[in-house]
């Protein structure tokens, strides 16, 4: 009898964690969509600042081809110079995975493709990892990795 009770408690606890993770996944998916909507329109007034607001001022951004960026200001300047009005990012459907980080936030991983603005060419695909921190009710990315860049065949 005790064994069955312990098993039931384990199943219920696992179900509670899954429900919590479902809510967390929905939150991070919404943040991802909002952040990259601003990224995709960063050539429009106010959108680059909106995109920047999703990142901690001391963001560490690791890009397999571009190297490491150590601050939000430098990352945003590079985005403005090389991305805005030229490329848009699309999340690969079904690829987003979110895991909680106790007393901090979440880790999001997935795949994304990059398409030329004004055309249908989506030539690049890569993997990403975003470390999201929740502090004082505000979610921000503290670390970002974009890697495994390759042709999207």
Language-model segments: residues:
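Repetitive helical segments and hydrophobic/amphipathic motifs
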Residues: 12-13
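Short beta-strand segments that buttress and anchor functional surface loops
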Residues: 109-116
């Amino acid at each position: 009898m005790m064994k069955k009770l312990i098993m039931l408690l384990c199943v219920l606890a696992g179900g509670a964690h899954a429900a919590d993770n479902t809510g967390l996944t929905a939150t991070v998916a919404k943040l991802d969509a909002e952040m990259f909507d601003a990224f995709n329109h960063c050539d429009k007034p106010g959108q680059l600042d909106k995109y920047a607001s999703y990142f901690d001022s001391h963001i560490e951004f690791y890009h397999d081809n571009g190297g490491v960026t150590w601050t939000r200001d430098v990352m945003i300047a590079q985005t403005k110079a090389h991305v805005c009005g030229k490329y848009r990012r699309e999340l690969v459907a079904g690829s987003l995975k979110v895991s909680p980080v106790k007393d901090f936030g979440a880790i999001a991983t997935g795949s994304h493709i990059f398409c030329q603005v004004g055309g249908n060419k989506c030539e690049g695909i890569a993997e990403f990892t975003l470390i999201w921190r929740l502090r004082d009710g505000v979610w921000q990315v503290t670390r970002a990795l974009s890697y495994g860049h390759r042709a999207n065949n």
